[in-house]
Each structure stands twice: as structure tokens, then as C-alpha cells.
């Protein structure tokens, strides 16, 4: 996304219509301005925010008029709002929420000033959604962009040969394409075929870090449609006009796969040093100039060394892809999951491979020195997809701090996936994630309400890519609406879209081709019509980076000097203003996501427009600034972290996001918050709080809302008291069993529930293996036979018949060797009544449990509850992990293990344990992983040099292993 080239041809001037915006035109003695009032230049939806912004010279209300195709249909008075800090403008608001007319050809006037024309329709943004998605096909690498596919999806704009081009970097030109790209000189001795993927931005580089968040966003758009709205038709096969249309797979998945296959190809092959890591990026070894089509690139290209950040981007997105393609293309899904797990193990072994910045000649850096958030994101995606509890410690021990996201800040990507994707083993994490998103989105509404123009940005947030910061915040608001039904979140999205499409200080639509006065000269090597008529201008739908007070390029710095006191004005529409006017995949991805959400919201027509100048349109938020999503290791309820003895209050500086089915904090009284019922807080005096494991609203804040909202119910009348949900405690464990043809184990399920209102309760439970329900029932307890070695998810729901429910989920690991360890080992967790068996059957089980487990990617030897696994090996090195599993019925508090090598192997570095010694070796728990609950596993790893031959698999000993 970063290009530092010198342009040799002056940029063309803006069209005349923009000149009119800047200098105005004289009508009589008064100077009229076109583009003031500032409106969304595409238009509005009937149930969205419809406030226009008028730049005025004073604070006196003025008369506005709305015409429709020349006929006056409404008028009113502007609402003075005062000076806007980010723009320096004195502004008024114009509220059009009472207008019921729809169609095109609307214009607002104040005195002699007039807006650009706009529409009001529920379909206003349908085409814009497909325009934004089309950006990705146009920027594909390794394929010819053909004329029939250059037009937008579902006819959003017409195809044209001017946007077609030969395949880029595909076995042609001086660099011979991306089919056999070597490593940067002196960094490795192999080459990779990395022909696919998307060109990142104005340059022709392809970056795993920035590509990761981009492909994740498109896949999350799909998962939202799959799991929340059910509206997959919008991105279905045939919707986007791409070469794969008609293959039976959703077009958005075909487009995302083009990038995903590139990212898979960037993984270091097996047998090489740092196998499983991902190369940070691939690009030219020197900067090229503009204009330049991809197939004209004269520069050699090279792979930049692997980084931990890139590797975790691969782990996260490949895990996400694995679950999406599982029922579409099982082979591709398996390939993705294998790559994701390899990447995770490699990142664990190389946690400090931070991009050095020594390879930035020819491409952007994307250096990220803090990768704990990437570890969290990858762990969340892998846990959602696999249910493997080894990823839980990373999730449990990470403190959420950020309120927005971007390529270097990815923790919220993990939170959003946990919130969107349903899985039995993530039930409580999902509840907590949804609450966390609503809390963050509320802070953005507060910021937005303080801005004169409808951007959810403070004056300090107008930096490189500020428009993408807005788009990302709108994603969070959109999900908050999905989870709560609170109209304020949807209206926040609406306001942000209004800003991007023209309701801003510059009266400019920042999306190419969409509006009357739009960005025309984005920084892009191929869409360089501003420099050379042999190259095309940009097609509709590309999002400009937007105002940037940093002014990193020389043209912006010289033309915009003095703008920094009014940072929202620091933008220049010139192809060589790369710090303010570049375009890139990670900016267009959230634009597409937000427009998809907005079209869903527009289609509902369920809520009336709540446009208002009142400050009550923002959702109150607690003052807590950081939080953790922490699942209990012994049950599915999310509990406070062990470092805190009480639930966090709204005034704390750090808090744990928790979820519970506990009863209301305030008895029968509730707050009707714009159609959604919330409990009233007991101790929180103002705004929103967090009490008794759930969100609540203070009485003062709730009572200030207009009718019919506000406080409802009556605590003094039991007949009117709101229903309180039951509580549930679930436990599950496995015991050994042999009899007849059934060998192994019995899974015992026990639920204990109570209801504060004394309601009769009904139970339902199910046992899930992978994605298959292997047993279900409607009792409070059960015992079932299981015959496979694997992890089982046990879920139980209790209902009071009046809408109150409680759900608990727990995880039980079943391994035959745990229940039939052989005569030389002590058998634990086996009931005496089921311990007798025939010698032949027992012998078969002992033989099975004592064998060395092996696969193409790892080998392992069991030692009771301890397992040594080689995760990778190359010429003279290896990585391995030791897993300590608790198969008992009580927690393990502290553990240590020992092992030694007989072939000369040596350990060079380790993670997740205190490893000491020099053969033999000892490892002990760290504070955070010392406690292992029943059925759970602690895992640590290390890297070392091999002795002779293959990496040795030694026995692991220690009291915890027996």
C-alpha cells in the first residue's frame, strides 16, 4: 500500500464541477456554493440517518428547502451545532427524517447554496456493494482481466475493454513472473510459485499481513450472511460477474480463494529451516514508476523472509477458510487446516521473528513488532474450527485493549469471529464476544455524536487511511446491531456511510465513480489515466485513503501545508498524493462489508429513521478501557480471571468480559432500550454498567429515554415482575468400560438447575463429536457409551417455559490409554464396577495404547498423561511439543516433567514453560498454565538441533505423567 515513486507527468486538474465547489460561482451579490449543504451524494435509505450538514458563517438558524425534480416538497430550519473541531467549519444540521418521498433527483438549498443531487430509496446502495467487491477481481495477480468480467456484479456498472489487461506476473517480462520467485538474496535457497493473490495497493506487491485482514473481512462478510442474516443470495454464485461465476460456489468465496491460495503458497515448505512459517511478502526488488500495468513490470521479484506476524495471519485465515469450505470442497478445507496448524506450531517455535524492515525497496513494509494480538486471533480461529483446547490458554490469557482494528491490530478479528460463528464449544465465548463488541461500538457512537460531520473519528484519528478507520468502526457498529437490534448502532453505520459518500468538509465522495463530486485520481499504477490516456481511469467502487494530517508525500505536504489544525481537510485528489489518496485491498474490504450490512438493513424497512440532533442518539458506555474474554477451564460459563476476586465495575480501568445466565440485577424492573430489554443496574449510577455477569443500564440513563422506551415492569407487583432466567451447572466425565463388543468408555452427564421464580424446568442435552451429534436427550442426567478416541462437546440447555433459558457446555477428552493403562500402570478414573475384563480384550487395548503414534507431520510417544510430539524437522533442526493432559477428576495444581536424548539432540529455545538443564532436561509450569482442569491439556514447545537421523522421540517422565 506504500509507494514512494516520483511522477514525471503532472496530474490533471479536477473536473469543472469540483472547481465550482472550491471557488463557488457568483449569483447577483451573494456567493453561492454548489455542494453545500453536504449530503450523501448517492443518497439515503428510508430507515437510515438523513441528516445533511450545512457550512454556515454564523450560528443563526436558516431556512432550508428540499426539492424533488424541481418541485418543493419540504422546508424547515437548520439546527446550529457550532464549530467542528476536526474541520474548523461552523456547521448546521438539516434533519430530513420526516420526508416520506422516495426516488431520485432530490436537492437541498439554503439561500443560494445548493447540494449535489441525491436519491432516497431502499436500494440506493445495492450497486455500490458490488462495485466495492469488484475491486478485488480487477486487482488479481496471475490472470488476464478480461473485458466481459470488467463490469460490476449484477450489472452495477457496464463492462469495458479499457479495464482489461494481460495477466500480471505470469511467466512474462524481465522478472519471468511469480511462478518461480526466489528468496531475497542471501536469505534462502529455494523458490516458490506464488502466482495468485491480489495486488495490494498502488504498487504490485503482495503482502501476507495486509492480505490476511483483507481476505478475512470478505470471509467474515460471508459468515455473517451464513450465520446471522441467512442472506447468502447477495454473494451467491453468479452475483459478482467473475470468471468462476456459474461453478456452483458463492462468488465471494471464489474471489477470496484466489487470495487464500496465494497465502498458502507463501508457507515455508517442509524440510526447510522454519518450515511452516509464512514469508512476509513478495514484491519487486526496486521501486517502479507510474503508469505501469502489471505485465509491464521490468523488475525482478523476491520473497522476503518469514515473520511471526505473517505466519499467524496465515494460521488465522486458513483456519477460517477450513471451516467455510468443509462442506464445499473437503480437499481444500483439509489443505487449509493443515496449513493453519503448521503455521501455528511454527509461530510458537519462532515467536520473535519480527519483520526487520530491511526489504522495503520496491514494496511497503508492514512491520509489526507486537504480535500477541495475532496469536490471540489465530488461536480464536483455530479453536472455533477445531475445538482443540490447546488454543484456550492463548485466548484465556490475553487482555483485550483495542477499540478498533487494522492490519497491525488484529485482536478484534478473533473477537468478531467468536461472536459470529456458532459452535457448541464456543457458546460462552460467543456471548462474551458479542457483549464486548457492543461495548466498543458504543464508544464509537459517542465519538461520532461529538463530531459535526458524521465521522466516528476524533481530531487525532485523521492519519494514513482514516477512511478505512471509519469503515472498520462501522463494521463493529453493524455487528453490534446484529447482536442487539439496537437501532442506534445501525444509524451509526448510516452516518458513517453518509460521511464517506460526501457529507464531509470537502463535500467529496471518497469512492471512485459514486456521486457527483468524487475522487478521480487515486494512486494506482494501472488506473493512471490522469498521467497517460493509454491507461484507464479507476472504475467505480475504490475507496480513497482519505484525510491524513501526516502528509507523508511531498505533493500533499506542499499543497496542504497548514491543514493540520483542521485535519479533516488534509486530503488531495492527485495520483501522486500517495499518503492521502492511495487505494488498497484492506480498505475496500471493510467498505464492501459495511455496504452489504447496510443493504440488509435497508431491506428490512423495519425501523423508522431516528435522525436527530439530540445527544441521546448515542449509546452510553462504561469507562472500562480493557477487557479479556476468559472461559473457565472446567465449564462453559465464563468466569472472572483468577487475578480478580470480584466482578469488574463500570468504573474500573481493566475488566473481564463475562457471560452468565444469572438473574436480573434489579428484580422485575427492566430497561426498554429501543426495543431491547436490559436489566437495570443496582450500583452503576450513570450510563451502562456490568453487574452480576451481564450488561445493565443505570436507572438515570434509562429513564431519560423517550416513550415508549425507558423503565418498564413493576418490582412491587409479583404478577408484573419480569421473568428471571434459571441457572444451570453442568458436569461431565468419562469412565472405563468393557463388555461384549463395546470397548472403552462411558460418558456421564449431570445437570443441576434451579429457577428463582420456582418455574418447572425442562432439560435438553447433546453430545457432539466434530460437527456430528452422536447422542441427545431430554433428561437432567445420562450415561452413554462412546467408542472413539477424541474430544466430545457436551451441551445442556434448561428452559423455564417462559423464555428464560440457561445453557452450559463442557469438553471431555477420551483416550483409551487413559482408562486401560496396562498392568504396569496405575489405572485412574475407572469405576471398580467396570474394571474387570477378559484378558484378551485388555491385552488388545494395552497394545494399542503403548504404540508410537506417527504421521507424515509428527511422531509421538505416550507416557501416561504426557505426550512428546515432533511437529517439524529439517536438515539439522526440529521443533516439538510436550502435552500434559489431566485425565483425573480433580485439578492439577503445578506440574513438571523430565526427558533426555540419547542421540545428541540439544534444545536451543523454548516457550510456554520454564525449561532447564542440558540433557537431561526438565520443564515446569509457568504461573498461567500451572492449573490444568480435568479433561484439559497444557502444552509447551521447544526448538533444537538434531542428532543423527530423524528427530528422536524420548519418553517423558514425572509424577504428572503417571
Curated annotation (Swiss-Prot):
Q: Which CDD domains match?
A: E_set_Cellulase_N
The residue ranges of the CBM10 domain are 670-699
* Listed GO MF terms: cellulase activity; cellulose binding
Q: Which Pfam families would you find in this protein's record?
A: CBM_10, CBM_2, CelD_N, Glyco_hydro_9, PKD
- As recorded in UniProt, its EC number(s) are 3.2.1.4
Question: Which InterPro entries did the record assign?
Answer: 6-hairpin_glycosidase_sf (IPR008928), 6hp_glycosidase-like_sf (IPR012341), CBD2 (IPR001919), CBM10 (IPR009031), CBM10/Dockerin_dom (IPR002883), CBM10_sf (IPR036601), CBM2/CBM3_carb-bd_dom_sf (IPR008965), CBM2_carb-bd_dom_sf (IPR012291)
Q: Which residue intervals make up region (Disordered)? A: 608-651
Which cysteine pairs are covalently linked by disulfides here? 671-702, 681-696, 866-961
Q: Which residues form the CBM2 domain?
A: 859-962
Question: Which reactions appear under catalytic activity for this entry?
Answer: Endohydrolysis of (1->4)-beta-D-glucosidic linkages in cellulose, lichenin and cereal beta-D-glucans
Gene3D superfamilies, sorted: 1.50.10.10, 2.60.40.290, CBM10, Immunoglobulins
A GO biological process of this protein is: cellulose catabolic process
Give the residue range of the signal peptide: 1-32
Keyword Nuclease found = no
* Active site, UniProt feature: 203 (nucleophile), 523, 573, 582
**UniProt keyword annotations, A-Z:** Carbohydrate metabolism, Cellulose degradation, Disulfide bond, Glycosidase, Hydrolase, Polysaccharide degradation, Signal
Q: Which family does it belong to?
A: Belongs to the glycosyl hydrolase 9 (cellulase E) family.
- According to UniProt, the name of this protein is Endoglucanase A
Organism listed in the record: Cellvibrio japonicus (strain Ueda107) (Pseudomonas fluorescens subsp. cellulosa)
| Gene of this entry | celA
Amino acid at each position: 500500500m506504500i509507494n514512494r515513486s516520483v511522477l514525471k507527468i503532472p496530474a490533471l486538474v479536477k473536473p469543472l464541477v469540483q472547481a465550482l465547489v472550491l471557488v463557488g460561482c457568483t449569483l447577483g451579490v451573494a456567493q453561492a456554493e454548489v455542494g453545500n449543504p453536504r449530503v450523501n451524494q448517492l443518497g439515503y435509505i428510508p430507515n437510515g440517518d438523513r441528516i445533511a450538514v450545512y457550512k454556515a458563517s454564523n450560528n443563526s438558524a436558516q431556512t432550508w428547502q428540499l426539492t424533488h425534480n424541481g418541485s418543493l416538497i419540504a422546508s424547515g430550519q437548520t439546527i446550529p451545532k457550532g464549530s467542528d473541531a476536526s474541520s474548523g467549519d461552523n456547521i448546521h444540521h438539516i434533519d430530513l427524517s420526516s420526508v416520506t418521498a422516495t426516488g431520485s433527483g432530490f436537492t437541498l438549498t439554503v439561500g443560494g447554496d445548493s447540494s449535489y443531487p441525491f436519491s432516497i430509496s431502499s436500494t440506493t446502495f445495492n450497486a455500490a456493494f458490488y462495485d466495492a467487491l469488484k475491486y478485488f477481481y480487477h486487482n488479481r495477480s496471475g490472470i488476464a482481466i478480461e473485458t466481459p468480467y470488467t463490469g460490476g456484479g449484477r450489472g452495477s456498472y457496464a463492462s469495458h475493454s479499457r479495464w482489461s489487461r494481460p495477466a500480471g506476473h505470469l511467466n512474462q517480462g524481465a522478472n519471468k513472473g511469480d511462478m518461480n520467485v526466489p528468496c531475497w538474496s542471501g536469505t534462502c535457497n529455494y523458490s516458490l510459485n506464488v502466482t495468485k493473490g491480489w495486488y495490494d495497493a498502488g504498487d504490485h506487491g503482495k503482502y501476507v499481513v495486509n492480505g490476511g485482514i483483507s481476505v478475512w473481512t470478505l470471509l467474515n462478510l460471508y459468515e455473517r450472511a451464513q450465520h446471522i442474516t441467512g442472506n447468502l443470495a447477495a454473494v451467491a454464485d453468479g452475483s459478482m460477474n467473475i470468471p468462476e461465476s456459474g461453478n456452483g460456489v458463492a462468488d465471494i468465496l471464489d474471489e477470496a480463494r484466489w487470495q487464500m491460495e496465494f497465502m498458502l503458497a507463501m508457507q515455508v515448505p517442509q524440510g526447510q529451516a522454519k518450515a511452516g512459517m509464512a514469508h512476509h511478502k513478495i514484491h519487486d526488488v526496486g521501486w517502479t514508476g507510474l503508469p505501469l500495468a502489471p505485465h509491464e513490470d521490468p523488475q525482478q521479484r523476491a520473497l522476503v523472509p518469514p515473520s511471526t506476524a505473517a505466519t499467524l495471519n496465515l494460521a488465522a485465515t486458513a483456519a477460517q477458510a477450513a471451516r467455510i469450505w468443509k462442506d464445499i470442497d473437503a480437499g481444500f478445507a483439509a489443505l487449509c487446516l493443515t496449513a493453519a496448524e503448521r503455521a501455528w506450531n511454527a509461530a510458537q517455535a519462532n515467536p520473535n521473528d519480527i519483520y526487520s524492515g530491511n526489504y522495503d525497496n520496491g514494496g511497503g513494509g508492514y512491520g509489526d513488532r507486537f504480535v500477541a494480538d495475532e496469536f490471540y486471533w489465530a488461536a480464536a480461529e483455530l479453536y472455533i474450527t477445531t475445538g482443540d483446547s490447546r488454543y484456550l490458554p492463548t485466548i484465556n490469557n490475553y487482555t483485550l485493549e483495542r477499540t478498533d482494528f487494522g492490519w497491525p491490530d488484529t485482536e478484534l478479528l478473533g473477537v468478531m469471529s467468536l461472536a459470529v460463528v456458532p459452535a457448541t464449544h464456543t457458546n460462552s465465548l460467543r456471548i462474551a464476544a458479542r457483549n464486548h463488541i457492543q461495548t466498543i461500538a458504543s464508544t464509537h457512537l459517542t465519538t461520532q455524536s461529538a463530531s459535526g460531520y458524521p465521522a466516528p473519528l476524533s481530531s487525532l484519528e485523521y492519519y494514513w487511511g482514516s477512511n478505512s478507520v471509519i469503515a472498520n468502526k462501522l463494521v463493529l457498529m453493524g455487528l453490534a446491531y446484529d447482536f442487539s437490534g439496537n437501532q442506534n448502532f445501525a444509524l451509526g453505520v448510516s452516518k458513517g456511510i453518509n460521511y464517506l459518500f460526501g457529507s464531509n468538509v470537502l463535500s467529496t465522495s471518497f469512492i471512485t465513480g459514486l456521486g457527483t463530486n468524487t475522487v478521480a485520481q487515486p494512486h494506482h499504477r494501472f488506473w493512471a489515466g490522469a498521467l497517460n490516456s493509454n491507461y484507464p481511469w479507476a472504475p467505480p467502487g475504490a475507496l480513497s485513503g482519505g484525510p491524513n494530517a501526516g502528509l507523508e508525500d511531498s505533493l500533499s505536504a506542499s499543497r496542504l501545508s497548514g491543514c493540520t489544525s483542521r485535519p479533516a481537510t488534509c486530503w488531495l485528489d492527485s495520483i501522486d498524493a500517495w499518503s492521502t489518496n492511495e487505494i488498497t485491498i484492506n480498505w475496500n474490504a471493510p467498505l464492501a462489508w459495511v455496504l452489504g450490512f447496510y443493504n440488509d438493513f435497508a431491506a428490512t424497512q423495519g425501523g423508522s429513521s431516528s435522525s436527530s440532533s439530540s445527544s441521546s442518539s448515542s449509546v452510553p458506555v462504561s469507562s472500562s478501557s480493557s477487557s479479556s474474554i476468559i472461559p473457565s477451564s472446567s465449564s462453559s460459563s465464563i468466569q472472572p480471571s483468577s487475578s480478580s476476586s470480584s466482578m469488574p465495575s463500570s468504573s474500573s480501568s481493566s475488566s473481564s468480559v463475562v457471560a452468565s445466565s444469572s438473574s436480573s440485577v434489579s428484580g422485575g424492573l427492566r430497561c426498554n432500550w429501543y426495543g431491547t430489554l436490559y436489566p437495570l443496574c443496582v450500583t452503576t449510577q450513570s450510563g451502562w454498567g456490568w453487574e452480576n455477569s451481564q450488561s445493565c443500564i443505570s436507572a438515570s440513563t434509562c429513564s431519560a429515554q423517550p416513550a415508549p422506551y425507558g423503565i418498564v415492569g413493576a418490582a412491587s407487583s409479583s404478577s408484573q415482575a419480569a421473568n428471571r432466567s434459571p441457572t444451570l451447572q453442568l458436569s461431565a466425565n468419562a469412565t472405563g468400560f468393557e463388555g461384549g463388543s463395546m470397548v472403552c468408555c462411558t460418558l456421564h452427564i449431570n445437570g443441576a438447575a434451579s429457577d428463582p421464580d420456582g418455574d418447572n424446568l425442562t432439560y435438553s442435552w447433546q453430545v457432539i463429536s466434530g460437527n456430528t451429534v452422536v447422542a441427545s436427550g431430554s433428561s437432567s442426567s445420562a450415561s452413554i457409551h462412546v467408542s472413539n478416541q477424541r474430544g466430545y462437546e457436551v451441551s445442556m440447555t434448561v428452559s423455564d417455559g417462559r423464555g428464560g433459558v440457561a445453557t452450559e457446555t463442557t469438553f471431555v477428552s477420551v483416550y483409551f490409554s487413559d482408562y486401560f493403562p496396562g498392568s504396569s500402570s496405575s489405572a485412574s478414573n475407572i469405576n471398580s464396577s467396570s474394571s474387570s475384563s477378559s484378558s484378551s480384550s485388555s491385552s488388545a487395548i494395552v497394545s494399542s495404547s503403548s504404540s508410537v503414534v506417527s504421521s507424515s507431520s509428527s511422531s509421538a510417544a505416550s507416557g501416561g498423561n504426557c505426550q512428546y510430539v515432533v511437529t517439524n524437522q529439517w536438515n539439522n533442526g526440529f521443533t516439538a511439543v510436550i502435552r500434559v493432559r489431566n485425565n483425573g477428576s480433580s485439578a492439577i495444581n503445578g506440574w513438571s516433567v523430565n526427558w533426555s536424548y540419547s542421540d545428541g539432540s540439544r534444545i536451543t529455545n523454548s516457550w510456554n514453560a520454564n525449561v532447564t538443564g542440558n540433557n537431561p532436561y526438565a520443564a515446569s509450569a509457568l504461573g498461567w498454565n500451572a492449573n490444568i482442569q480435568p479433561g484439559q491439556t497444557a502444552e509447551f514447545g521447544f526448538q533444537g538441533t538434531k542428532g543423527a537421523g530423524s528427530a528422536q522421540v524420548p519418553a517423558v517422565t514425572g509424577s504428572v505423567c503417571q
